[in-house]
Swiss-Prot record:
Protein name: Cellular tumor antigen p53
Taxonomic lineage: Eukaryota, Metazoa, Chordata, Craniata, Vertebrata
Subunit and interaction comment: Binds DNA as a homotetramer.
Site (Interaction with DNA): residue numbering on this chain: K105
Keywords: Activator, Apoptosis, Cell cycle, Cytoplasm, DNA-binding, Metal-binding, Nucleus, Phosphoprotein, Transcription, Transcription regulation, Tumor suppressor, Zinc
Biased composition (Pro residues): 46-81
Gene3D superfamilies: 2.60.40.720, p53-like tetramerisation domain
Entry's Gene Ontology molecular function annotations: DNA-binding transcription factor activity, RNA polymerase II-specific; metal ion binding; molecular condensate scaffold activity; promoter-specific chromatin binding; RNA polymerase II cis-regulatory region sequence-specific DNA binding
């Protein structure tokens, strides 16, 4: 090339030319702290890379959407119209017991193991001991309900008589007036009326036994006598005590008969004696069928000798009677027999020796 290439401009000069072309306002921009030695930097030496930008903030974790069909806790089966009265220990070996008491007239509550029956006074505490072999799940409860024992009354609801219902008889104020069974000393007791059967029940939370004890005691009160008109009216009742899980499912069941009376010890003694007299048969005593007895044979007539048979002859007239009597005596004397004894009410002339003592018979002498 003929023409010589123009020498390249220094980078500094190029920058200064460009800087002078900027408006004055741009030249007043603040410079970095190391602006005094910026020219000493090599044009080919790269500056420090800028710090990486901070990572974007992570989005907040959104709450998991609720499931479409959340699991529901198990529910209790609907209450049957005729509840079962069969004992059922279940997987937890559910049992009940009672405090040992005699048959004294002063006792307020006594239990008969022979009859499986509780005798108690009106509105007096009846301690029931609850035992389990395996601890039930937390949240379990005990439910008590009364039903009539006989089949013709089992569909009816056991309730108090109108008299005791008006009288009330409860200091806690939690139990409805018509409920027969109440719990004493437990503020957690809840009283229910079944929507289907209209039966009354009381529920208390299950509490494990204390240290050194093998049972939990619940105090039940029965608020009406068994003989009250308009209430139980002498109809026997059963108390069904059930152990229920947190969802109301049945875990165990125990039943016992209850009689509310004025003298529990006396009534227990009488009923146990009657039970033994019936031969220990449970429930209603059935009379044992006696073997058929043969009809008694009619008594056989004894065949007598005609000569020894006695006959009776009716005679009219005293004279004729005396004459026939003398003939009869003469015949007996001829046969070597004794004369017949005179009958009472008839005066007969006695002939013979006079008695040795006492009054002597006066005989008329023959002149």
């Amino acid at each position: 090339m003929a023409e010589e290439m123009e020498p390249l401009l220094e980078p500094t000069e190029v920058f200064m030319d460009l800087w002078s072309m900027l408006p004055y306002s741009m030249q007043q921009l603040p410079l970095p702290e190391d602006h005094s030695n910026w020219q000493e930097l090599s044009p080919l030496e790269p500056s420090d890379p800028p710090p990486p930008p901070p990572p974007p903030p992570l989005p907040l974790a959104a709450a998991a959407p609720p499931p479409l069909n959340p699991p529901t806790p198990p529910r209790a089966a609907p209450s049957p119209v005729v509840p079962s009265t069969e004992d059922y220990g279940g997987d937890f070996d559910f049992r009940v017991g009672f405090v040992e008491a005699g048959t004294a007239k002063s006792v307020t509550c006594t239990y008969s193991p022979v009859l499986n029956k509780v005798y108690c006074r009106l509105a007096k505490p009846c301690p029931v001991q609850v035992r389990v072999g395996v601890a039930p799940p937390p949240g379990s409860s005990l439910r008590a309900v009364a039903v009539y024992k006989k089949s013709e009354h089992v569909a009816e609801v056991v309730r108090r008589c109108p008299h005791h219902e008006r009288c009330g008889g409860g200091t806690d104020g939690l139990a409805p007036a018509q409920h027969l069974i109440r719990v004493e000393g437990n503020p957690q007791a809840r009283y229910h009326d079944d929507e289907t059967t209209k039966r009354h029940s009381v529920v208390v939370p299950y509490e494990p036994p204390e240290v050194g004890s093998d049972c939990t005691t619940v105090l039940y009160n029965f608020m009406c006598n068994s003989s009250c008109m308009g209430g139980m009216n002498r109809r026997p009742i059963l108390t069904i005590l059930t152990l229920e899980g947190p969802g109301g499912q049945l875990l165990g069941r125990r039943c016992f008969e209850v009689r509310v009376c004025a003298c529990p010890g006396r009534d227990r003694k009488i009923e146990e004696e009657n039970f033994r007299k019936r031969g220990g048969a449970g429930g209603v005593a059935k009379r044992a069928m006696s073997p058929p007895t043969e009809a008694p044979e009619p008594p056989k007539k004894r065949v007598l000798n005609p000569d020894n048979e006695i006959f009776y002859l009716q005679v009219r007239g005293r004279r004729r009677y005396e004459m026939l009597k003398e003939i009869n005596e003469a015949l007996q004397l001829a046969e070597g027999g004794s004369a017949p004894r005179p009958s009472k009410g008839r005066r007969v002339k006695v002939e013979g020796p006079q008695p040795s003592c006492g009054k002597k018979l006066l005989q008329k002498g023959s002149d």
